[in-house]
A protein has these predicted regions:
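Conserved S-adenosyl-L-methionine
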Residues: 70-74
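S-adenosylmethionine
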Residues: 88-92, 96-145
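Class I SAM-dependent transferase core
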Residues: 1-64, 69, 99-102, 106-116
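Conserved SAM-binding loop of SAM-dependent methyltransferases across substrates and taxa
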Residues: 75-88
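Hydrophobic packing within well-folded, soluble alpha/beta domains
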Residues: 68-69, 82, 91
Length: 145
């Protein structure tokens, strides 16, 4: 339930709360079409995907205009929840699978997120430098570095 997000992040603005609340229905729509998130795991959407993505924010606050790349974003995790949480931080979400980026672009458009760009590309072909690299279940640290 979205209330779990609100419990762990009580200082969210009303706009952020609305966006986090909307996430479930947007992903439910897409999950019925192309299985963005494991169907068995979807019932745990807010805890296993949204809160898990946001957990870094309990330890690290990103300053305005920081540039972050989310590698292997899949359905947009952790990038989309973090972009909602940090609206003045610039996120680039990449994935080699174009259908995943298609879904991510629809989520971004539906939530009117202006601080995210997307690319269908593998990390080794990215030329731009970023302040931080984030990912979930993509590769071991040695491979990413």
């Amino acid at each position: 339930m979205v209330q779990e997000v609100f419990k762990y992040f009580p200082n969210l603005t009303e706009i952020q709360r609305e966006k986090f609340t909307s996430l479930y229905d947007i992903y439910a729509f897409w999950n019925n079409k192309i299985n963005v998130i494991s169907r068995n795991d979807f019932k745990n959407f807010y805890v296993r995907h949204v809160l898990h993505s946001m957990s870094i924010a309990k330890f690290k606050h990103f300053s305005n205009d920081t540039n972050i790349i989310d590698v292997g974003t899949g359905g947009g995790f952790p990038g989309i929840p973090l972009a909602i949480l940090f609206p003045h931080v610039n996120f680039t979400l990449i994935d080699s699978k174009k259908k995943k980026i298609f879904v991510v672009n629809d989520v971004i458009k539906s939530l009117n997120l202006k601080n995210i760009t997307t690319k269908s590309i593998r990390l080794e072909f990215v030329k731009k430098k970023y302040d931080y690299l984030i990912c979930r279940s993509v590769a071991d640290t040695k491979t990413l570095l």
